[in-house]
Structures are given as structure tokens and as C-alpha cells.
């Protein structure tokens, strides 16, 4: 039986795509996954180009795979994702031992590309943008319990000045309303309890409803999904403040299964920086969204993405960012120093801020966010949290799962119950706060 190894870089969209690659090659060629590239017949790197560091890791991994291919000449190496979309033929020029290069929108052609490589002996490159065709050619997910990603749209039409996504994944295109509901219903019928809706700007969703001329927005989609039997929890990522409508806020008042955790990237707290980034909203408008959300969900936890050291960022700009973070009380968030990406407008902006200053600002921001996150964790001590069990923790002994606020929680369960608990919702009493996780005890009477 042929074995497949996939290494995934970057966002949840890439994780979803990697799962689809595995499903596709299992359906077409009977391939099974391995966690060791040395044992694989096919190795795929699903890449991310959002920051230079992630891109560098890909080429570092390719260097190691070159050595592996010397010992396994029949090993097939494929590069997919956003670096593949951005670099295309250059990947093969840089690493001629790569066999297949494919973009996010052509992963459904992966089996054909592999077959052509084997038949012709020629490397294959397909980084075209056939809109959302791939969803018509991918097999159903094999996920049977727990949580599952469902991609509802692809691409981005916002063109923020620093971001490569519109160039690597194309413009925004939504899947049809009926297709999304069919996929969700199929997953729920197999035992999946939590649905995570995915898109680069997921709340910009506008899906065609059957043969009608009507279009469903994101709020309506959620209202329909919650009615599907078996769906117990709904999340979504990543949303954009510009598309965070009052209709979507109103859904939070009607759909308790929509979690009280929101990841909403703000990027900065200074209007000057937000304008330079071409984000399309002001700091005040972002704050207004959060205040409205907390009015309908007082227990809402908020995480975000932040960029420091953007070209032109002054100390006053940075202080405005810190003030916003203090005011809105963010949970665990992603904080980065600006990474200029080739082909984006921001890459050409004059940047005279020393790296040491940027690094100090990053450390200051991280300390503030981590302090706020720790306070949120401390407030959970003694609480009983509804937790969806994902599987064994890294120690191989404890189980781990996620609470509604996306916190990872570890707990011990009797050995004979472990397999039965995976994929289930259970109630856990929080007993200890660690650096990045919580520990708790299973409340025996409350297994759902």
C-alpha cells in the first residue's frame, strides 16, 4: 500500500486543503498517511507565503528532501499552496528534483498531475485559477467525529497593501449555498459535532441558492447550518472587520451554538497605519464592532492578528495599538513584525525603522497580550467548561480538547473510556492554569 506524507504550513485553509489532498489520493490511489517522510512514496509540502520566514522553511525542507530522494529515486515530491502559486516554475528551477507544483485552486488535479509525471517523466506545474472548480471534483471528507473544517469560499478581493493572498489564491469566490449545506450534513451524519467554516474573508460569503437568483449571505448560511441534525457547535475563521455586518451580530443573539469566541484580525490600532495597510476601516469602527458583540455576548473572548513595524509606524502609532489592546482585552493572538512580500504595494514603501525598535515593540505587545490571556485563563479556574475532545495530548496519556473559547484543555480519563470519549462533548472542571493550556477533571455525570 502506497504511503503519503504531507507537511502543512500556515493557516486553517491550508490544513483543510491538506486534508482534501489526503482524501483525494486515498480515493484515487488507495494511499494512506504516514507521519514519516522516510516511509512515504509521495511527499507533499502545502506551503504558505504570508511571511518570508514561512517561505524560507519550505526551501529548507526541500533541501532535506533532495537528500532523501537520493536514497529513494522513485520518491515523488510535490509542492502546493501559496508559495507554489507565487513561484510556480521557479520552484522547479530552484529544486529540479521536485516532480509536481500545484496551486490552492488546482489541488483537485493532483492525481492527474502525478500520473502525468509518472507517464512522461516530465515535471508538472499547474497554478491556474479555475475559480472554485476544485470543490466539484473532491471526494467527501473521511472525518467521522469531533470537529471538521468546511471551506465556504476562496480567495480575497480586499488587496491589503501588505498581503499576497489575492495574488496566490485569487479573488473572492463563494461556494454554492446548497453545496455547503450538503457537506455539513454529510459530516454531521458521520458524527462530526463541530463545524468550522473557512475562508480568507469568511464573512464576505455570498453563495448562490440552488437554481434561484437569490444569494445567501454569511448570516443566513449560519442560520441554516444550525438546523442540521448533529451540529452542536459552529466556529468560523478568518473574518474581516469590513464585512462584519449588523446582520451577523444579530445571528449571535439567535444561534447559541455559534461559539462566544471571535478571531477578528485588526492588524493595528492607529488609523494612519490602517490606512497605509488599506484595511478599509478605522480603529473606532473596529472598537464599535467589538462593543456591539459584547453587548449580545458578554462572555465573548476576542483574539486577533497584529502587525508591528509596518513602514512609517511611529512611536505614537504603536502607543495607539497598545491602547486598543488594553481597552478591548484580547485573548491569545498572533503578533508579528512586518514582513515585506514581493509584489505587494507595501514592499515598496520606505522603511527606516531599525529592526531593534521593531523587535522591542513586538516584545512589548506580546507581553501585554500574554498578560491579558493569562488573566482570562485565571478566571476560568473552577469553572465547568463544555469541551470537545480532539484526541490524546502529546504526552500520549492525557486527553485534550477545546473549550468554547478555543482554550486547549488537558485532562485524565480512565484508560477504558479514552476511545469512547474522543470526538465527544464532555464537561470539564478547570483545576490548573499552565502557560498555554489548562488542566481539568472530567465531570463524570456530564458526558454529552
From Swiss-Prot:
PROSITE patterns in the record: MTTASE_N, MTTASE_RADICAL, RADICAL_SAM, TRAM
SMART domains assigned to the protein according to its UniProt record, in alphabetical order: Elp3
EC primary class: transferase
Amino-acid positions noted as binding [4Fe-4S] cluster 2 in the UniProt annotation, renumbered to this chain: 156, 160, 163
Domain Radical SAM core: 142-377
Organism of provenance: Polynucleobacter necessarius subsp. necessarius (strain STIR1)
Ion transport listed as a keyword: no
Keyword Zinc: no
One Pfam family, short name: TRAM
Name the record gives this protein: tRNA-2-methylthio-N(6)-dimethylallyladenosine synthase
Domain TRAM, chain residue ranges per copy: 378-444
EC number(s) given by UniProt: 2.8.4.3
